[in-house]
């Protein structure tokens, strides 16, 4: 019975609005980018690997995963054997170059390599504003850095990745950025001229378009039309 009010509400919502409701408060659906975080991913083992995303995109990090035999798709045992387990950090640029986790904070922990059915996945949404107090906010035109440290085998190499959030609006150096105002929004320096400022000129005042379905009588002519109709009814009745 609890689903009945929700179903009734959905039936009352116009069909063109349903895609907008599905997009959520951000107003746009983002793409998803997948990265398999393990030592067999050669991209993560070299400096400079960059994933480019847009605002509202998602980055899905898949942790190392093994089946009961110790071998999993896309993630073989690391150097020295054993299941790979990592702690992922978001760090500064220098922390990325030196693979120093102390210059950042812990983001996720891949500590379940034998999870049933599928690997553990963490998702990062590159949103401009976060609705959560602990949520991270990202800015267009900036780079963000992720590294990992092994929790068991210290001989595993540093894995790292750089994420670039596209794209920042270009502006000349030294100039203050001009905010983009919504349509029909006036800035603080806009002067509004009243009719007295035109001194005899005939300002172009926008007119309302007539209804396509037909025209309606003017309000001031309505009493006259009612009087004529009443007179005709009285005359015909007599």
UniProtKB/Swiss-Prot annotation:
Propeptide: 215-238
Lipid-bearing positions (GPI-anchor amidated glycine): 214
GO terms of biological process kind: axon guidance; cell-cell signaling; ephrin receptor signaling pathway; negative regulation of angiogenesis; positive regulation of amyloid precursor protein catabolic process
InterPro entries on file: Cupredoxin (IPR008972), Ephrin (IPR031328), Ephrin-A_Ecto (IPR034252), Ephrin_CS (IPR019765), Ephrin_RBD (IPR001799)
Signal peptide: 1-22
Glycosylation sites: 38, 67, 100
GO molecular function annotations of the record: ephrin receptor binding; transmembrane-ephrin receptor activity
Keywords attached to this entry: Cell membrane, Disulfide bond, Glycoprotein, GPI-anchor, Lipoprotein, Membrane, Signal
Entry-linked PROSITE patterns: EPHRIN_RBD_1, EPHRIN_RBD_2
Bilayer topology term: Lipid-anchor; GPI-anchor
Domain Ephrin RBD: 30-169
One Pfam family linked to the record: Ephrin
Subcellular location: Cell membrane
First-listed, main subcellular location of the protein, grouped into a coarse class: membrane
Tissue: Expressed in brain, skeletal muscle, spleen, thymus, prostate, testis, ovary, small intestine, and peripheral blood leukocytes.
CDD domains: Ephrin-A_Ectodomain
Described function: Cell surface GPI-bound ligand for Eph receptors, a family of receptor tyrosine kinases which are crucial for migration, repulsion and adhesion during neuronal, vascular and epithelial development. Binds promiscuously Eph receptors residing on adjacent cells, leading to contact-dependent bidirectional signaling into neighboring cells. The signaling pathway downstream of the receptor is referred to as forward signaling while the signaling pathway downstream of the ephrin ligand is referred to as reverse signaling.
Family: Belongs to the ephrin family.
PANTHER family tied to this protein: EPHRIN (PTHR11304), EPHRIN-A3 (PTHR11304:SF5)
Name under which the protein is recorded: Ephrin-A3
Species of the source: Homo sapiens
């Amino acid at each position: 019975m609890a689903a009945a009010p929700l179903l009734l509400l959905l039936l009352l919502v116009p069909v063109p609005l349903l895609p907008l409701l599905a997009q959520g408060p951000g107003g746009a659906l983002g793409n998803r980018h997948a990265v398999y975080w393990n030592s067999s991913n050669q991209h993560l083992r070299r400096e400079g690997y960059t994933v480019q995303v847009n605002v509202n995109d998602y980055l899905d990090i898949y942790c190392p995963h093994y089946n009961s035999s110790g071998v999993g798709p896309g993630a073989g045992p690391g150097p020295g054997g054993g299941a790979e387990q990592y702690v992922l950090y978001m760090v500064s640029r220098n922390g990325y170059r030196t693979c120093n986790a102390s210059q950042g904070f812990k983001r996720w922990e891949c500590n379940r390599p034998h999870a049933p059915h599928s690997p553990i996945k963490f998702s990062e949404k590159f949103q401009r504003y976060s609705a959560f107090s602990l949520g991270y906010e990202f800015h267009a035109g900036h780079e963000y850095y992720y590294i990992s440290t092994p929790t068991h085998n210290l001989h595993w190499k540093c894995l790292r990745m750089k994420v670039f959030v596209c794209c920042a609006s270009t502006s000349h150096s030294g100039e203050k950025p001009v905010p983009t105002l919504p349509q029909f929004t006036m800035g603080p320096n806009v002067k509004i001229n009243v009719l007295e400022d035109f001194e005899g000129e005939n300002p172009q005042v926008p007119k309302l378009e007539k209804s396509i379905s037909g025209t309606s009588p003017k309000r001031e002519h309505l009493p006259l039309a009612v009087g004529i109709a009443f007179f005709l009814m009285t005359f015909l009745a007599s």
